[in-house]
Amino acid sequence: MLLLELLKALILGIVEGLTEFAPVSSTGHMILVDDMWLKSPEFLGSQSAFTFKIVIQLGSVFAAAWVFRKRYFEMLYIGKYQPAATETESADGKIGKRVKPKRLTLWHVLVGMIPAGILGLLFDDVIEKYLFSVPTVMIGLLLGAFYMIFAQKFSERYAHRENIDQITFFQAFVIGLSQAVAMWPGFSRSGSTISTGVLMKMNYKAASDFTFIMAVPIMLAASLLSLVKHIGYIHLSHIPFYIIGFLAAFIFGLLSIRLFLNLINRIKLIPFAIYRIILVIFIAILYFGFGIGKGI
């Protein structure tokens, strides 16, 4: 029996790692895989199961932090991590002053974090209490899918900036607003912010990079805060489940993020939107047709 429960923890960690940063909604997948199928509260208890989900989400967050570690070092440290200054040349061929190239800074990330940070502090308990249900998640999945389709179709009419270092503070703030909207479960943080990024004339890779770089600090803070609030529900007997789930989420998070970043400029958003619509149909059949998940 213990082996079966450890296998369930492994599966949940894999699902979390694969879906947390893809624009497919990790919440929707957790409802399908855990709430409707594996039912972690049955072997962990309801509060401990919630803590387990926080722990495996941290695995995904650390995976993203590892992938973008050089970017964070560049934003936080000086020295070899800072881009070198370059000399400018005037029209008459004379060498002018040395200037540093434009680049993404910590201030861009902080500006992007402001909307979701404020909304999370004010309404986190309300969102958790009233919006975490199967019907509301299905609504979020559908709305997010339609927004992704709109973003891809509408943005095809203009050229996109190729480099994340060209992002402006205004773009960062607007993308941050969309991250706040994505606090509706099922909408998908990455789906919302990448879509907004391409609408703001960023290319898909640059929008994805900024999405992940911006998400790590706020997700890390939110996860650690939730973990502190629920620390009393961690039991020594559950530690193996936490370790397996965390490691699975970290490893598969690394694979998922790297694969996604390599593909996003080619496949764009519509394939993910179609997948989300199919997922909604599947969940709806289980929920309305067979009553699976009615107690969620």
Swiss-Prot record:
It is a multi-pass membrane protein. GO terms for biological process: cell wall organization; peptidoglycan biosynthetic process; regulation of cell shape; response to antibiotic. Its EC number is 3.6.1.27. The chain crosses the membrane at residues 48-68, 104-124, 131-151, 167-187, 208-228, 237-257, 272-292. The keyword Metal-binding does not apply. Its main location: membrane. One of its GO terms (molecular function) is undecaprenyl-diphosphatase activity. PANTHER family: UNDECAPRENYL-DIPHOSPHATASE. Catalyzes the dephosphorylation of undecaprenyl diphosphate (UPP). Confers resistance to bacitracin. This is Undecaprenyl-diphosphatase.
